[in-house]
Amino acid sequence: MKVKSKEKEFKETLGLVDLQVNGFGGVDFNSPDLTPEKLQKSLEAILSTGVLTFLPTIITESETHLKICLSNLEYCRKELPLADLMIAGYHLEGPFISKLRGFSGCHPIQHICEVDQEMFFRLQEAAGGNILLVTLAPEINGSIPFIEKLSGEGIIVALGHTNASSEIIREAVESGALLSTHLGNGTSPKLLKNNNPIISQLSEDKLSASFIADSYHLPPNVLKFYLKVKGRNKVILITDATAASSVMPGRYKFGNIE
């Protein structure tokens, strides 16, 4: 629908959805100090961009830290009507990812670990059962049965921060993985020419893929190529936003990174 004002013509659309938001408007969702007041400020900033629904994203840290962050988010969601409206659930990115340089990205290596199903379900309890999306590396020990378990419970499994072979990626997809997280990022700048995890994921028809389309994480020509290969029905655009998004230049924290 087109809406006209005196100065401009606007298009009225449905609210946008973002599957990966680590923080926004000066507020870090990975901080154990999150309060309802801070979250309300962040939600209003997110809403002003046209995003109506999103998944707060918690990255690799100690189990204690992860439980605090998830329980704080869940408490705030219950306290704030706007949070209950906008937060569809939570995205757990890590800690079951690759430790290899480049593939680990900004995740603290000391807290990256093998799959621990009992640990995950303790985190799920802290989150009130609302972890809806888990990003993991399928080559990590224990990943394949974990993918089957999560898929069976209706939790979406995404592949990310991975150096898996094409065979392992295929096995992960057949076990229930549905998505590639920020494909083209969280990887090494030095990959094999043909058999590498980016090409392997692009070639899997059952995998959708999310991309950070800011012209910084992926050059426009690279993103254009990825989109052509995947096709628009298998593409999800995300921000992977942090606390520094939408604020003035300065010093901000994302987890333990400043």
Q: What is each of the regions a protein language model found here?
A:
Residues 78-85, 127-129, 152-153, 230-231:
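Short helix-capping segments at alpha-helix termini
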Residues 146, 168-258:
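Active-site-adjacent C-terminal substructures of enzyme catalytic domains
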Residues 22-28, 40-69, 85-98, 127-139, ...:
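Divalent metal-dependent hydrolysis catalytic cores, especially in the metallo-beta-lactamase
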Residues 64-75, 103:
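Metal-dependent catalytic neighborhoods of phosphoester/phosphodiester hydrolases
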Residues 92, 99-196:
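Divalent metal-binding pocket/active-site signature
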Residues 15-17, 158, 179, 237-238:
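Residue-level marker for buried hydrophobic side chains located in beta-strands
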Residues 35-37, 116, 254-258:
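Gly/Ser/Thr-rich active-site loops/lids in small-molecule metabolic enzymes
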